[in-house]
């Protein structure tokens, strides 16, 4: 039985390739998914690739990984800095966890509404 790797993407990542391509690149999330699927073949991994703009849905996916995941790679987008719920769910997952970002989060300016 292959191990299942969860790749979880948060808010606005569905707009990759459309939203500020000079900052986030021109590749769509579907292109990223295809690249990940291809890479997983070489490691005998089943890939569970998920994206949502809803915090609770991201938490539910992490809960699924607790039951059958061998690892979690997460780009929680803007929720990275604010979600206690995502942090709590990830802390319950005992396998390896990797937090990724497309841009340098330390170089981002403060958000003003």
Regions found by a protein language model. Name each.
Residues 57-61, 82:
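Short acidic active-site motifs
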Residues 74-104, 108:
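Mid-chain, well-packed structural core segment of small domains
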Residues 111-113:
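Conserved small/polar residues in nucleotide/adenosyl-binding loops
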Residues 65-72:
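Short acidic/histidine-rich motifs immediately flanking catalytic phosphotransfer sites
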Residues 2-5:
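Extreme N-terminal starter segment of soluble prokaryotic enzymes
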Residues 48-56:
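Short beta->alpha junction loops
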